[in-house]
Amino acid sequence: AASSEAASETETAELSTVEPGKLIMSTNAAFPPYEMTTDSGEFEGIDIETAQAIADKLGLELQIDDMDFDAALLAVQQGKADMVMAGVTVTDERQNVMDFTDSYATGIQSIIVKEDSDIASVDDLAGKKIGTQRGTTGYLYCSDDFGDENVVAYDNGLTAVQMLNNGQVDCVVIDNAPAKEFIAANPG
């Protein structure tokens, strides 16, 4: 999780938030199992439960603002959200503009392909059309290693997987945990 302010238990009484009485969390709720929406439009997932526990401990009402990943990061930087929880990987660039908690998950990048794909490893990605989620480390790695011309950035991982299913990209590079969720939901 990244936040605009850090507070220890002893500093809780002095914690200032964007809106008094609320803890505003920005997220991109299309990143299972960390954050997603149910069929009824409710937010759920590991990050949602963690944010609720933080809000409860601080005696605040949790407000979740769902937006594109890049916008979720910017919301904290612009003072529109108190924290972002959206599977955010710690990078030097991000540490220059926001504070991070201790890591509570380790994200490794995975490649999602169709069953009949000729892509068997990262070595096979050269010259392929790679789908990613805009602004993520998967996007950054693929753009750096395979060139912007080979990377298509989508607003969220779900859209990237839909484009793979429709044949518009050859693969999707995304964190391992959501990759498993997307594969389970999209056989073939």
Task: List each language-model region with its residue ranges.
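Short loop->beta-strand "edge-of-pocket" segments that line small-molecule binding or catalytic clefts
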Residues: 23-27, 122-135, 150
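Ligand-binding cleft/hinge of the Venus flytrap
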Residues: 35-40, 51-59, 138-155, 183-187
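A ligand-binding cleft/hinge motif common to bilobed small-molecule-binding domains
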Residues: 71, 88-96, 141-144, 170-188
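Alpha-to-beta junction loops
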Residues: 60-61, 77-86, 128-129, 156, ...
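Short helix-initiation/N-cap motifs at beta->coil->alpha
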Residues: 48, 64-75, 117, 152-166
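Bacterial lipoprotein signal-peptidase II cleavage site
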Residues: 1-9
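Acidic, polar ligand-binding/catalytic clefts
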Residues: 52, 61-124
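Extracytoplasmic small-molecule ligand-binding "clamshell" domains
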Residues: 11-87
